[in-house]
């Protein structure tokens, strides 16, 4: 079965909480399978870490510091040959507010 590259939707999901991201990916893939469309993914991209170093004391002690980190997780889902029913059902999905979605046609 040959997959045409011209007619696909690429959905990029990003979140700071990986459990919310996994639930969102599962709902998108379930919706694609319900409308009988081929979906590929979720493809996990490497997590990005940002580490912030902050002084504990407001005045003197430079030796006393605290480190905080923020991890961002990303996944990609490709939907091939989407129908109008698939697009309508994807637009009506309730995705948690902590998940950022970017859609490319």
From Swiss-Prot:
Keyword check for Plastid: yes
Single annotated GO MF: structural constituent of ribosome
Keywords: Chloroplast, Plastid, Ribonucleoprotein, Ribosomal protein
Subcellular locations according to the entry: Plastid, Chloroplast
Chief location: plastid
InterPro entries: Ribosomal_uS10, Ribosomal_uS10_dom, Ribosomal_uS10_dom_sf
Biological process annotations from GO: translation
SMART domains named among the record's database cross-references: Ribosomal_S10
Subunit structure: Part of the 30S ribosomal subunit.
Name of the featured protein: Small ribosomal subunit protein uS10c
